[in-house]
């Protein structure tokens, strides 16, 4: 699940996973751009939330996810991706229990995937590049 953005959501998923006797891989969604139109926890809370999620039964924290800033300035977009990578590195370096699998960086979509890859993305989301623009009817 790539869009866990709060402790409350993580706890709900964890409870259901434990009831079913499974472990669910999750990515913590971080709002690196600070844009109100985007989901995700504030970047300043990411390390604490990651460590708390890592301690939950039924979940395996596998990485972080963000959507790049919706701006034309590549420097701004890259800065958000670079910050997410640094945050991931800090989480891993902390050695906190349950964070050792926090290796994935899901960042970058069709329009900014090259920037994301340059900043260390391990997962990119390229739906528009494959399927074309969405048709809103």
Spell out what each predicted region is:
Residues 123, 136-137:
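Active-site loop ensemble at the mouth of alpha/beta enzyme cores that anchors a bound cofactor
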Residues 1-113, 119, 131-133:
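Conserved alpha/beta-domain cores
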Residues 120-122, 127:
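Active-site-proximal glycine-rich helix-loop-beta segment
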């Amino acid at each position: 699940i790539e869009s866990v953005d709060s402790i409350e959501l993580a706890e709900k998923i964890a409870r259901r996973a434990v009831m079913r006797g499974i472990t669910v891989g999750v990515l913590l969604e971080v709002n690196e751009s600070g844009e109100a139109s985007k989901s995700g926890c504030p970047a300043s809370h990411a390390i604490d939330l990651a460590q708390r999620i890592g301690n939950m039964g039924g979940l395996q924290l596998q990485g972080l996810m963000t959507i790049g800033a919706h701006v034309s300035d590549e420097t701004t977009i890259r800065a958000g991706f670079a910050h997410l990578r640094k945050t991931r590195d800090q989480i891993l370096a902390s050695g906190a229990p349950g964070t050792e699998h926090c290796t994935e960086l899901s960042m970058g979509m069709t329009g900014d995937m090259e920037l994301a890859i340059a900043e260390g993305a391990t997962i990119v989301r390229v739906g528009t590049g494959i399927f074309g623009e969405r048709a809103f009817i």
